[in-house]
């Protein structure tokens, strides 16, 4: 099944939009089973054929492989990749551990993105002319920026969810109730029988499980500012989220398309609609940068729905020869 839970092969859509203006530039279909390395290489080739300049590839955790980073460096294509944190001993975890004290400092928090952040520079080695079947020479180097972000709210939500699950399991075991398959897995991972205390939760394993919750690491070769890197990645997520929302609202699911031409047509409509959504966000961002005087509308980097909810209170009165805006009412965010 695909991400829509349909019994159909996965289809992916690659979007390229102008971050500053939100204008849509380019999109294409490709099969969901295409390896991430191939996707990145084809994207680099596409932007070269279209003679596009100042392109920055922004991608999620599925595209942060060493090969993809090397391909971008070799082809001089700038990138911002989200890094996986699930592997023990990985570089991202090591960097987080080195900077934990900084995340505990309230001064590391940014009021715009509402996250604590820290940045580390990494000297990255790669082969500028790789040859299949031969060991990498790693003769070239590049300076990468690893921007780390911590959200205590996400951490607390994960901790509360796990605590609730473990206490429910313990209650069921004490009352000899049957456990679900998922609860059995949690039991094997977080519980043990103590000779004196009986059934207990292994706190060390809970701490290990929660150790990197709430963290995100973005690696980039070009963006030194952590807030700008976060904003660029958040825009990528906004595009994906807006596309998924519009797919449902516009009836663009494949089960509602009569043939491939109808699917392609509806996808084009979504492409334009998603671009409009990003254009609204881009204009709001311009307002935030240019209007920092007291008394101006104070916006943080929230979802489209929350921002539009605030703007929904702005009323306009029209006359034959003009118009004016009424008083702005409502809670500022």
Stretches found by the model and what they are:
Residues 1-333:
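Anion-binding and metal-coordination hotspots
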């Amino acid at each position: 099944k695909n991400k829509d839970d349909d019994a159909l092969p996965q289809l992916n859509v690659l979007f390229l939009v102008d971050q500053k203006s939100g204008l849509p530039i380019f999109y294409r279909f490709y099969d969901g089973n295409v390896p991430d390395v191939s996707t990145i290489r084809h994207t680099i080739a596409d932007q070269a054929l279209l003679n596009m300049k100042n392109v920055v590839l922004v991608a999620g955790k599925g595209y942060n492989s060493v090969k993809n980073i090397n391909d971008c460096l070799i082809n001089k294509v700038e990138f911002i990749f989200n890094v996986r944190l699930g592997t023990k001993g990985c570089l991202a975890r090591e960097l987080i551990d080195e900077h934990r004290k900084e995340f505990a400092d309230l001064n590391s928090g940014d009021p715009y993105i509402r996250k604590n952040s820290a940045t580390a520079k990494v000297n990255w080695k790669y082969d500028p002319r790789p040859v299949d079947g031969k060991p990498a020479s790693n003769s070239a180097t590049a300076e990468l920026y690893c921007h780390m972000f911590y959200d205590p709210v996400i951490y607390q939500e994960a901790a509360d969810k796990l605590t609730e699950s473990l206490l429910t399991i313990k209650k069921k075991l004490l009352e000899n109730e049957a456990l679900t398959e998922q609860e059995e897995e949690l039991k094997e991972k977080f519980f043990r029988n103590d000779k004196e205390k009986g059934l207990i939760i292994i706190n060390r394993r809970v701490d290990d499980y929660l150790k990197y919750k709430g963290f995100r690491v973005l690696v980039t070769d070009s963006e030194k500012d952590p807030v700008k890197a976060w904003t660029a990645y958040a825009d990528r997520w906004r595009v994906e989220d807006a596309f998924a929302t519009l797919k449902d609202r516009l009836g663009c699911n494949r089960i509602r398309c009569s043939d491939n031409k109808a699917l392609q047509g509806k996808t084009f409509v979504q492409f334009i609609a998603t671009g409009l959504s990003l254009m609204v966000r881009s204009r709001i961002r311009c307002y935030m940068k240019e209007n920092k005087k007291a008394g101006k509308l104070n916006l943080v980097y929230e979802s489209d729905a929350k921002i539009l909810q605030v703007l929904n209170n702005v009323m306009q009165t029209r006359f034959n020869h003009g118009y004016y805006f009424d008083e702005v009412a409502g809670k500022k965010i």
